[in-house]
């Protein structure tokens, strides 16, 4: 398990109400003590009741009778009818049950049948008639029914065993108990009976309700077996802890560290899918903090993990760029929420909040080049010159290795990483029109996202300097808005393009054509001439004459 760095970091997560304590406070005792002068146990007393009070607002306890009322929907009664006609036990399980208690709406329903899940699905099709669409996957023993916007997955109760080099299980028919044993976490192992005689009866052998109430992620059985059998569950563990703002039970967390190397057998696409779900969470930094703490991050994104270091020379230390990165990521998430709430208030936005996951990836990778660019200078101390350019060059390879998309999404992240120092440089100096024009031209349609990222990057603990930066950023934003409004045409490419230059001077693609294009673009950006044909043509001929082009 990785040791935790000390310093200001904990304030990031405490400020946003994140759970970082385990149920037994072994992991952060010294961390809290170093920051607040109190023990982990003392902090746990403050943390857990606070979170439990929050849990009371987002979770309810139900009797079986109340659960039956919550399941009083046509689809569940039809499933009950189908199962009873076939004489088999039938249960709704997993995330749908969990989300009932968390009062989160869900249209994805998993049903376990002690017998043939396919048979119940086919019987349900006969009951529903043409209103239902049924897909059967006989090789997997599963079936899916789509009905009135809901998706119901049917599977027979089963028990599983695994070989060491594969996460593909050997499956046998089993009981409900066998099926609950194989579930990843206690909060996902609860079941509610759908048979008419027991409709609404909760079956919770591992106290998933208690773990939901306490905000704990825990495995039903030995976590070493759970994670070794299917290493993807390690990422699911982190993901659920992040999405639900739960903490990971001590022994479960220790098993993450012991089995971290097993993640190597998981294909990149599955890893990327889980990480994107972490990214979409309300507090994404929590997930990457836990990945680093348990030792998974060095195996998945070693370039990011490598930032978790503080080096000191001649009494001068640089900041921990890993924790800085997580703070920037969290700042971006909060900025997105503020913008969404503002637009929703002004009726400019409807529907659920949809985070910009690629802006968040840009935040995570914005300083990725600092490890390679770090140098010591006797006068300046630690420097990270050109880390933005180095980081931008690293992005495509990281995306390729992680099986993230290599299309416009990767180029968007790469662009923001490359440009993320530009607004800061402008804000740190006299804010000129020409500098802002160049920034808008280079960032294009992504200028607003770039400004969000760069403002999130202002994490200085020097409040005077931070206040000045933010004030200058306000000026930059105002100037961007002003230039967009009055100079929009000027921000476009010059009205005379390379093809016309080649035709006019009878040139082939060459360095000379590039120089002439550059001269026109510079003149437009610097406001030397208007972006109009006549003045640009005069400038073009003048520049061509200087280059000896007739």
Regions found by a protein language model. Name each.
Residues 4, 20-21, 39, 47-48:
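Short, low-complexity intrinsically disordered segments enriched in A/P/G/S/L with frequent Arg
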Residues 13-17, 26-32, 46-49, 53-550:
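Catalytic cores of the polymerase beta-like nucleotidyltransferase superfamily
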């Amino acid at each position: 398990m990785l040791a935790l760095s000390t310093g200001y970091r904990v304030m990031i997560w405490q400020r946003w109400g994140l759970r970082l304590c385990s149920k037994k406070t072994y992991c952060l005792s010294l961390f809290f003590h170093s920051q607040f002068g109190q023990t982990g146990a003392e902090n746990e007393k403050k943390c857990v009741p606070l979170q439990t009070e929050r849990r009371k607002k987002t979770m309810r306890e139900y009797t079986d009778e109340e659960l039956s009322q919550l399941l009083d929907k046509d689809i569940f009664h039809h499933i009950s009818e189908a199962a009873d006609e076939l004489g088999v036990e039938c249960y709704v399980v997993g995330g749908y049950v969990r989300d009932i208690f968390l009062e989160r709406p869900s249209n994805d329903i998993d049903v376990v049948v002690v017998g043939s899940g396919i048979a119940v699905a086919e019987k349900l099709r006969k009951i529903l008639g043409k209103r239902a669409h049924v897909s059967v996957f006989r090789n997997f023993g599963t079936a899916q029914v789509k009905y009135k916007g809901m998706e119901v997955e049917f599977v027979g109760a089963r028990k599983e065993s695994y070989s060491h080099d594969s996460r593909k299980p050997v499956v046998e028919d089993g009981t409900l108990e066998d099926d609950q044993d194989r579930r990843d976490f206690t909060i996902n192992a609860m079941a509610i009976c759908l048979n008419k005689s027991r409709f609404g009866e909760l079956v919770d052998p591992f106290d998933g309700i208690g773990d939901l109430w306490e905000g704990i992620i825990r495995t039903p059985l030995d976590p070493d077996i759970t994670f070794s059998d299917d290493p993807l569950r390690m990422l699911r563990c982190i993901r659920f802890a992040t999405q639900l703002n739960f903490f990971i039970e001590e022994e479960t967390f220790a098993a993450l560290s012991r089995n971290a190397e097993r993640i190597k057998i998981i294909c990149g696409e599955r890893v990327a899918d889980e990480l994107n779900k972490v990214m979409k969470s309300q507090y994404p930094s929590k997930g990457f903090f836990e990945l680093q703490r348990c030792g998974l991050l060095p195996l998945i994104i070693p370039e990011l993990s490598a930032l978790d270091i503080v080096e000191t020379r001649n009494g001068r230390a640089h900041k921990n760029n890993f924790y800085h990165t997580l703070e920037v990521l969290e700042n971006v998430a909060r900025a997105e929420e503020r913008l969404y709430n503002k637009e929703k208030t002004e009726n400019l936005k409807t529907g659920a909040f949809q985070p910009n996951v690629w802006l968040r990836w840009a935040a995570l990778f914005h300083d990725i080049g600092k490890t390679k660019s770090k140098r010591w200078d006797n006068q300046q101390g630690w420097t990270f010159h050109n880390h933005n350019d180095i980081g931008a060059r690293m992005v495509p390879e990281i995306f390729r290795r992680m099986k993230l998309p290599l299309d416009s999404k990767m180029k968007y992240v790469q662009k923001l990483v490359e440009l993320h120092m530009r607004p800061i440089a402008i804000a740190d100096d006299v804010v000129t029109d020409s500098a802002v024009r160049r920034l808008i031209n280079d960032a294009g349609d992504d200028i607003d996202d770039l400004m969000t990222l760069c403002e999130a990057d202002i994490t200085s603990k020097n409040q005077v300097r931070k206040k000045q930066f933010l004030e200058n950023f306000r000026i930059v934003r105002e100037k961007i808005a002003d230039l967009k409004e009055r100079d929009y045409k000027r921000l476009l490419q010059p009205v005379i393009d390379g093809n016309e230059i080649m035709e006019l001077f009878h040139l082939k693609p060459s360095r000379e054509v590039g120089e002439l294009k550059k001269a026109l673009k510079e003149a437009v950006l610097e406001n030397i001439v208007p972006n109009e044909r006549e003045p640009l043509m005069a400038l073009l001929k003048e520049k061509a004459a200087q280059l000896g082009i007739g």
